[in-house]
Amino acid sequence: MHLIRSLWVVAAGLLVAGAAQAQTTGLDLAKNKACMACHQVDAKRVGPPLASVAERYAGQGPAMVDYLAGKIRGGGRGAWGAVPMPAQTHVSPEDARLLAEWILSLAPPK
């Protein structure tokens, strides 16, 4: 019984470490791709806070990753006010998906 409990503790620790690593990697990628020039995680800049984007779209299913990745690469207008988001064609489709997954991970647990 003690062994099973120990394994659960180790597994939980690995999950927490993995989530923290994803947060760091996502933020690093967002900085590297210049997302942070217009966005912040928790405060409005030119664009909406990424945490607000996460709250709006979280829990809407796995297709939301593709939707947000498309918005990152293709840009958009009208969803967050008058300022349009320019297309970020320098972001690869793979990096756009990673960014979208990271952004969605910023939503508070429900």
Where are these regions (language model features)?
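Bacterial N-terminal signal peptides that target proteins for export
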Residues: M1-V9
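Electrostatic cytochrome c docking/interface patches
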Residues: G18-A30, R56-A58
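The canonical Cys-X-X-Cys-His
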Residues: K33-V41, L99
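Sec-exported extracytoplasmic/periplasmic mature domains
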Residues: K31, E55-A58, P62, R73-R77, ...
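Solvent-exposed loop/turn segments at secondary-structure junctions
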Residues: A43-R45, H90, L106
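Bacterial N-terminal signal peptides
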Residues: W8-A17
